[in-house]
Amino acid sequence: MDGKSVTDWVSHEPIDEWEVMMQKVAQFHHKHNFAGKNGHDMGYRIALTVEELGELSAAITKGKPLDECAEEMADILILLMGHSIAMKVDL
């Protein structure tokens, strides 16, 4: 399951919407130097994911509007995409 690195994704020519989204996440990682600032530490990233899952759970259990729930879901999706980039796993 060899995936692309941040550099690979930044220089890659996307062929579909998924690859466009992956490239945007990689560009964000590159811009903020995640690899150099411990942003690819998976322990840290998993803790962020747990936090985001808690926010989604709270939005759902409190009956928040669907757009707020969707925002929390998007946060989790973006984090998971970033996990795959940090771990160089092809989704």
State where each predicted segment sits.
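Flexible "arm" and connector segments at domain edges
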Residues: 1-91
